[in-house]
Amino acid sequence: MSNTQSFFSQSLAERDAPIRSSLLKELERQQSQVELIASENIVSRAVLEAQGSVLTNKYAEGYPGKRYYGGCEYADEVESLAIDRVKQLFNAGFANVQPHSGAQANGAVMLALTKPGDTVLGMSLDAGGHLTHGAKPALSGKWFNAMQYGVNRDTMLIDYEQVEKLAQEHKPSLIIAGFSAYPRKLDFARFRAIADSVGAKLMVDMAHIAGVIAAGRHDNPVDHAHVVTSTTHKTLRGPRGGFVLTNDEEIAKKINSAVFPGLQGGPLMHVIAGKAVAFGEALKPEFKTYIDSVLANAKALGEVLKAGGVDLVTGGTDNHLLLVDLRPKGLKGTQVEQALERAGITCNKNGIPFDTEKPTITSGIRLGTPAATTRGFGVAEFEQIGRLILEVFEALRANPDGDRATEHRVRSEIFALCDRFPIY
C-alpha cells in the first residue's frame, strides 16, 4: 500500500493509538457517569457524523453566494440550511451561524455595535452572569467601561431597579441580558424598556436557555432585543459553537461584517454542518417533549434536594439548572465537586451571589438536567440522583476529605443507572 493510500485508509487506532486511547476512555467516562454540568449535553450520532465530515477540509471565507474561495457550492448549501433552520426555530429575520463560540458571538456584537471605551451594562459574574458580559478578566471588561448589575440580596432575583438606576446613571451603549448561573426566567420586555429609556441597544445572550426558548417554554428574546446571541450546545443539543440573530437588517449587516472579516477568518464548515443538523432536530415535535422533560427533571431534582435540607438559590428553578448554596451544609464547592465525581456524578463548583469564597473554592455547585435527560432519565431517575447526592453531602459533613465507602456505593448505583440508559 502506498503512503497516499494508507493516509486515507488507516483508522485513528492504526495511526495514533494514544489519542484513540484517550477518546475511548472519554467515551467510557461519558457512558458511565451522570452528567449534571448545566452547560453540557450529549449530541446525536447524526450531529457527530456531520461534525466529523469532509467539510473539515473546506475553506469558505465569506457568506453563501459571496465566497473568497472556489469550490463552495456544497458549503453554501449547508450554511444556507443552517441559517434557514435557525431563523425558523426562533422566528428571526436574520441569522449568522459562523461564530466559533458563544464568546465569539458576543464579541462580534460588541465589535458591531460599540467602540472601545463605550459603557456596557451586564450581569456580574458573582451574581450569575458570564465572563463576556463585562467581567474584569475578559476582553469586554478590559476594552469597555463595564458596569455590572446583580441580584436582590433577599430574593436572589435580578434587581431590575438596580439595572434601571445604573442605566440612567451611566448611559450605556449596550445592555446585556443573560446568564451562566441564574435559575429563573428573564423579563426581556423590562430590559428593552430600560434600554430604550437611555438609547441603548439590548443584547440578549440566551446561550443557556436557547433550547427552552426554541421549545416555546420561555419568552422569545428575538421579539424584544435588538440582537440575540447564543451557543449551539447546552439546551439546544448541538455541536460546540455560536450564532447571532436579529430582526434589524442594518444590524444584521454590521454583525456579518463583524464576524467576517472583523473577528474571524474562515468558518468551521464541519461545525456549521453539525449546527444545521441540530437545528433540524430542534424543529421536530419531539424536541418540545425533550425540553418539557428537562424542566420537569430539574424541578424534581430540586424538590428532593430541598427536602433533604439543601438551600437552592432563589428557592428553585424555572429552567434547566439549579444553583446550590452549600453553606448551610458546611461544605465548599470544590470539595463537593470532587466527591461527586468520585461517586460518578459530574457537576461544577460555582459561586453563589454574595459569595465570600474564592472562585477556585466557591460556596456552591451548579447542577443541570439537559445531558442526563437526553440519555432518557426521567423524574424517577432524577429523584434517585437527588437522594444519592444527599448521601454524598452527609458523608462529606462527617468526613470532609471524603467517605470512600459511601462514594463507592453511590458509584455502583450510578453505574447501574447509566447502564440502563446507554449512549452511543
Curated annotation (Swiss-Prot):
The record marks H233 as: Plays an important role in substrate specificity. It is an enzyme of class 2 (transferase). It holds the Pfam family SHMT. Keywords: Amino-acid biosynthesis, Cytoplasm, One-carbon metabolism, Plasmid, Pyridoxal phosphate, Transferase. One of its GO terms (cellular component) is cytosol. One of its GO terms (biological process) is glycine biosynthetic process from serine. It comes from Ralstonia nicotianae (strain ATCC BAA-1114 / GMI1000) (Ralstonia solanacearum). The keyword Amino-acid biosynthesis applies. Homodimer. It comes from the Bacteria. The keyword Transferase applies. It is found in: Cytoplasm. It catalyses: (6R)-5,10-methylene-5,6,7,8-tetrahydrofolate + glycine + H2O = (6S)-5,6,7,8-tetrahydrofolate + L-serine. Its EC number is 2.1.2.1. Its cofactor is pyridoxal 5'-phosphate. The modification N6-(pyridoxal phosphate)lysine is found at K234. GO terms for molecular function: glycine hydroxymethyltransferase activity; pyridoxal phosphate binding. Belongs to the SHMT family. The gene is glyA2. This is Serine hydroxymethyltransferase 2. Pathway: One-carbon metabolism; tetrahydrofolate interconversion; Amino-acid biosynthesis; glycine biosynthesis; glycine from L-serine: step 1/1. Catalyzes the reversible interconversion of serine and glycine with tetrahydrofolate (THF) serving as the one-carbon carrier. This reaction serves as the major source of one-carbon groups required for the biosynthesis of purines, thymidylate, methionine, and other important biomolecules. Also exhibits THF-independent aldolase activity toward beta-hydroxyamino acids, producing glycine and aldehydes, via a retro-aldol mechanism.
